[in-house]
Amino acid sequence: MEIVINNVKNFSKWTLHNFTEKLRVFELRDKSDAELLKLLDDLKQELATFRVSKVTATGTSKLSKITLVRKAVAKVLTVYNQRKKEEARKKYKKLSKTPLNLRPKLTRAKRKGLTTKQLTMKTIKERKRAENLPKRKYALLA
C-alpha cells in the first residue's frame, strides 16, 4: 500500500503485521475516508492477531505492540469522527435547528439562562419612564 501525499510517499510502512511505530495524526488528516476505514480494518485485524498470540502465549514480544495498535485505532477513529462531525456542522449551519450533539457544550445554567436580547428588553412602563423622565443632573456649588 503506497500513497503519495504532498509529493512524499507515506504509509508504505503501514502494511499488515508491521505496526511498530507510532501513527501520526497529521498524516491521517490528509487521507480520504475510504483510506482511513481501510487502515482501521487493518489495525483491528492486527490487534486481533496480537490478542490471539497473547492468549496462546506464543509471542511475548508482541504484547508491547498491543498498546501501540490500540492507540493507533483510537487515533484513526478520532480523525474519522471529527471529520464526520465537521461535515454535519456545515450541513446544519444553514438550518434553524441543530442536533444536540452539534450544539456548543455549556453548563445547564448557561443553557437555560436568558439570551442577551432577553436581558436587555424593558417593559413598556420602564421605556416610558426613561423617555419622559431623563436622569437628573446635579451641579454642586463650590
From Swiss-Prot:
It holds the Pfam family Ribosomal_L29. It comes from the Eukaryota. Signal peptide: none annotated. Gene3D superfamilies: 1.10.287.310, 6.10.250.3450. Keywords: Ribonucleoprotein, Ribosomal protein. One of its GO terms (biological process) is translation. GO terms for molecular function: mRNA binding; structural constituent of ribosome. GO terms for cellular component: cytosolic large ribosomal subunit. Belongs to the universal ribosomal protein uL29 family. HAMAP family: Ribosomal_uL29 (MF_00374). NCBIfam families: L29. This is Large ribosomal subunit protein uL29. It comes from Theileria annulata. The lineage of its organism: Eukaryota, Sar, Alveolata, Apicomplexa, Aconoidasida.
